[in-house]
Each structure stands twice: as C-alpha cells, then as structure tokens.
C-alpha cells in the first residue's frame, strides 16, 4: 500500500534520527505496539521516518511510549503525523501566500530592509559630532604627525567632556 493512503491517525512521524536511521530497528521498536503497514526512512535529507500502523490505537500507544526514547543511537521525537508536506526548498510557510500583500506591508518592512537602515542610522548618529569638534580633530592630527594616537586622544577627551 502507498505511504500516503493511510489515515493520519495511523501515521507516526519519527524525528531526530540523525544519519543512522535503520528501517529494521524501527520496525522492531514500533512493531511491538501493533501490526505495521509500512516504515519509510528518509535518506535525502536523512534524519526522520514515517511509520504506519494498521490501527490508530497502536499508533497512539507507540507515540506515548517511544517519544524521547533512544532509537538508532539518537533520542527521537515521535508524534502523530499532521499530514502537511514540507517543501524541499525551505521557503516561507504556505500561510504567507494567503496574506494580502497590503496587509503585510502595513505590519512591518521586510527584515532585509530594516537592518541596513538601522546600521546606517547608528553610523550617522555616531558621526554627527559638531563641526567644531571635527575641525579640532583634524587640527590636532596635523600638529602631532601621529594620526592614530592624536585621534584616539581627542576622541576620548570629547567623550569625557560630554559626560561632565
């Protein structure tokens, strides 16, 4: 029988399998709780499996008993499958497509736009010293012929003046 034809309450998701997902070990562990229809272990990407039971009560017992146990060398997450297929491209969840575009814009700008603005804003604030202070710095650099030292000194002086 095909793995998608089982009712959801018979289908169990097994997560956190790592790369060592072993069909035989899963069949043995889950078969203890009742007859299985099938066991499917993901290979690309690895790390999860689906186990189908004949009876939904057996699936519920397996979830209750095996969640958090060690199988195939890993502490696994076991839960009833919710039936949603995940896309391989790991794009935005399907619910994002349902939201009207105008509504999304009203809530907040996209994250990509927000962080460069924040950065440029903080830069402009840190550079917004008065023109007199900028002149003071450039004059002290010319006098001392050691730009890095005089720059750091004048910078620390201006900070201490602001605090007082």
Swiss-Prot record:
It is found in: Nucleus; Nucleus speckle; Cytoplasm. Keywords: Acetylation, Cytoplasm, mRNA processing, mRNA splicing, mRNA transport, Nucleus, Phosphoprotein, Repeat, RNA-binding, Transport. Phosphorylated by CLK1, CLK2, CLK3 and CLK4. Extensively phosphorylated on serine residues in the RS domain. The modification N-acetylmethionine is found at residue 1. Changing residue 86 to E: Abolishes interaction with NXF1. It comes from the Eukaryota. Pfam families: RRM_1. Residues 119-164 are annotated as: 2 X approximate repeats, basic. One of its GO terms (cellular component) is nucleoplasm. B- repeats lie at residues 119-133, 149-164. Residues 1-90 are annotated as: Sufficient for interaction with NXF1 and SRSP. The keyword Nucleotide-binding does not apply. The modification N6-acetyllysine is found at residue 23. Residues 107-128, 143-158 have a biased composition (Basic residues). Residues 129-142 have a biased composition (Basic and acidic residues). Residues 81-164 are annotated as: Disordered. GO terms for biological process: cellular response to leukemia inhibitory factor; mRNA cis splicing, via spliceosome; mRNA export from nucleus; primary miRNA processing; regulation of mRNA splicing, via spliceosome. One of its GO terms (molecular function) is mRNA binding. The modification Phosphoserine is found at residue 5. Residues 10-83 form the RRM domain. Belongs to the splicing factor SR family. Interacts with CPSF6. Interacts with RBMY1A1. Interacts with SREK1/SFRS12. Interacts with NXF1. Interacts with YTHDC1, leading to recruitment to RNA elements adjacent to m6A sites. Interacts with SRSP; increases SRSF3 binding to specific exons. Splicing factor, which binds the consensus motif 5'-C[ACU][AU]C[ACU][AC]C-3' within pre-mRNA and promotes specific exons inclusion during alternative splicing. Interaction with YTHDC1, a RNA-binding protein that recognizes and binds N6-methyladenosine (m6A)-containing RNAs, promotes recruitment of SRSF3 to its mRNA-binding elements adjacent to m6A sites within exons. Also functions as an adapter involved in mRNA nuclear export. Binds mRNA which is thought to be transferred to the NXF1-NXT1 heterodimer for export (TAP/NXF1 pathway); enhances NXF1-NXT1 RNA-binding activity. This is Serine/arginine-rich splicing factor 3. The lineage of its organism: Eukaryota, Metazoa, Chordata, Craniata, Vertebrata. The gene is SRSF3.
